Amino acid sequence: MLFKEAQAFIENMYKECHYETQIINKRLHDIELEIKETGTYTHTEEELIYGAKMAWRNSNRCIGRLFWDSLNVIDARDVTDEASFLSSINYHIAQATNEGKLKPYITIYAPKDGPKIFNNQLIRYAGYDNCGDPAEKEVTRLANHLGWKGKGTNFDVLPLIYQLPNESVKYYEYPTSLIKEVPIEHDHYPKLRKLNLKWYAVPIISNMDLKIGGIVYPTAPFNGWYMVTEIGVRNFIDDYRYNLLEKVADAFEFDTLKNNSFNKDRALVELNYAVYHSFKKEGVSIVDHLTAAKQFELFERNEAQQGRQVTGKWSWLAPPLSPTLTSNYHHGYDNTVKDPNFFYKKKKSNANQCPFHH
């Protein structure tokens, strides 16, 4: 079974990279021997890098796949000690942030006996009983159990919670200067500033498995950049997240939220305008939902030229604001899951997040 998965990946990758049949057969022969001797096999650095890029390209829920080949891959399979691990995490955050000019990065640790990360994302806000991000209550309780104490605000950056092999679970507070955040304001509605809203610059997913040719990498944090609606529609407005619709509408001086007033819709549009322009004002990369949809159209054309079928999950590719203005909305997608890919960990069954845009 493992060899068949390895064979499918190697043949696919090596043909895309224009390797001769003789080289492909030699590599497959070596892998088959290694599996017979050890029960597994080890990817070359080139295979790891290209496999990670293919995983992004195959991510059905991601609208930002046009840039799959620009992914920066850090091979951290040799990282085993705590100092090196924390240094590699800080390095990833710094390089991905890039002073606001965000770059897509993935750091891949060993498939076995590597460090374990308990956070859903490397950077997220704590969730308390009466404030913060309700989606992070479980991680916040774990952090508190380990001795971490937040300030009790809506936007306390959670520490990194991790475990090295044969060691206890620990937490690590990031240097304040490492985490770039964007205060949210609206140039036409100054009252919005009084809500003291902000959001972190880089979404770095850390609760998914990366699978390449049958080998699972359980710790492989990765990032792209935000699509504006992920913050302005989902994170701030969903009633199981920050649930800010009424407060935002009040800041915009909308006197009613009756359904037939259309003020709920207006509030969403104005808040997304505020998020987008706040990020741009701070020099932080972000994409609006209509541009992202156009980029996905280009991705589809590029893939068609290469003779590859684009798979996708329609409900994720149609943005949550004005979806009918995008081509994604108007046709279906084959949701077949290809390998390599990113997979939700089984214990995280409620973690419905897009790999590169959440």
UniProtKB/Swiss-Prot annotation:
Q: This protein's superkingdom?
A: Bacteria
Record carries keyword rRNA-binding: no
Q: Which UniProt keywords apply?
A: Heme, Iron, Metal-binding, Oxidoreductase
Query: What top-level class of enzyme does the UniProt entry assign?
Result: oxidoreductase
Q: Spell out the molecular function terms from Gene Ontology.
A: heme binding; metal ion binding; nitric-oxide synthase activity
Q: Give the Enzyme Commission number.
A: 1.14.14.47
Names of the cofactor(s): heme; (6S)-5,6,7,8-tetrahydrofolate
In which residues is heme bound? Answer: C62
Biological process annotations from GO: nitric oxide biosynthetic process
Catalyzed reaction equations: 3 reduced [flavodoxin] + 2 L-arginine + 4 O2 = 3 oxidized [flavodoxin] + 2 L-citrulline + 2 nitric oxide + 4 H2O + 5 H(+)
Q: Does the keyword Metal-binding apply?
A: yes
Q: Which family does it belong to?
A: Belongs to the NOS family. Bacterial NOS oxygenase subfamily.
Anything else the record notes?
A: This protein is similar to the oxygenase domain of eukaryotic nitric oxide synthases but lacks the reductase domain which, in eukaryotes, is responsible for transfer of electrons to the ferric heme during nitric oxide synthesis.
Quaternary structure and interacting proteins, as annotated: Homodimer.
| Stated role | Catalyzes the production of nitric oxide.
Q: What is this protein called?
A: Nitric oxide synthase oxygenase
